[in-house]
Curated annotation (Swiss-Prot):
Protein name: Anterior gradient protein 2 homolog
Pfam families named in the record: Thioredoxin_7
Signal peptide segment: 1-20
Organism encoding this protein: Danio rerio
Endoplasmic reticulum in keyword set: yes
Keywords, comma-separated and alphabetical: Endoplasmic reticulum, Secreted, Signal
Localization: Secreted; Endoplasmic reticulum
CDD domains according to UniProt: AGR
Biological process annotations from GO: intestinal epithelial cell differentiation; positive regulation of cell-substrate adhesion
Placement of sequence motif Homodimer stabilization: 40-49, 55-62
Gene: agr2
Amino acid sequence: MLKGLLSVLLVMVALSSALGKPEKTTPKKEKEKRVPQTLSRGWGDQLIWAQTYEEALFWSRSKNKPLMVIFHLEDCPHSQALKKAFAEDKEIQKLADEDFVILNLVYETTDKHLSPDGQYVPRIIFVDPSMTVRADITGRYSNRMYAYEPADMKLLLSNMQRALKFLKTEL
């Protein structure tokens, strides 16, 4: 009787283990590769980005480098176009990496000096290490003074160099 019970138990264990195996499925390939979300938000993944405005001001002051603040929205087509042009421009990426503290924000800060002509996106504002907002460094539009478009990369590069020159003559 005991042998019969053991054989039934053994058969049941074998059946349950055979039936309990998961089906072999091939992993489905994702149609679109998702890029991990970093502080760069696509503006330059190899760059070191500050996380908050306060942290950026601290880095700017301690490293004696100007701060470049980029205001944008993830779902804004103008912001997306500027982001693509900014990320693909090797000169801008190199200058930003070597000589600037950089921060990109998808929200407004409490510092009203960062929106001298209104809150719109995309806009780029420069702040020197003495924490002075550089309102004199503007884009090419009179109604949105700090706005840049993908075609304005040469102007942005020129303004970045201007922010560095003023920094050296002011300090």
